[in-house]
Amino acid sequence: MASDFQMKAMNKVHGATLKLSGGGLGWHMYGMPVVQLTTIGRKSGQPRTSLLTSPVQNGNAFVIVASRGGDDINPAWFLNLKANPEVTVKSGRKPAVKMRARIAEGDERDELWKRIMDYKPHYGGYQKKTDRVIPLVILEPIA
């Protein structure tokens, strides 16, 4: 599993690629769209931005996976959006959109997990590395 330092470094390199290319490169990774998720830090109150892949999309909603590579702890961005579910999401060259995050549960989570596994089975390897149930988060536009 990648360390916090490695994950932050990868995120910074990815962000630099987006910036240097004028947003022309970096919006797809491993065949999935990339979303730029901005949460409010649960401790700091400051904006925190992460670049994440979305293996499933439903209309204007994105599904993101709080796998943290199969680590035993949830990613900081997940803890932040649990504390404050109002987030900002940017994907591609489209403007950023205010969205609300919610955690998929029960049958909805089961159906989404199946879709994710059918499309990107490597997520199953992450689940095998940890005892926690990897959360699936749905990002929906605020009407």
Stretch-by-stretch model annotation:
Residues 1-28:
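Extreme N-terminal tail/first-helix region
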Residues 24-25, 123-127:
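Short helix-to-loop capping/linker segments positioned immediately adjacent to catalytic or ligand/cofactor-binding
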Residues 28-30, 127-131:
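Short coil/turn segments at secondary-structure boundaries
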Residues 32-67:
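Short beta-strand segments
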Residues 34, 134-136:
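Short hydrophobic/aromatic beta-strand or adjacent loop that forms the aromatic wall/cage
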Residues 57, 140-141:
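Active-site beta-strand termini and strand-to-loop segments that position acidic
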Residues 68-122, 129-133, 141-143:
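Short, structured beta-strand-loop surface elements
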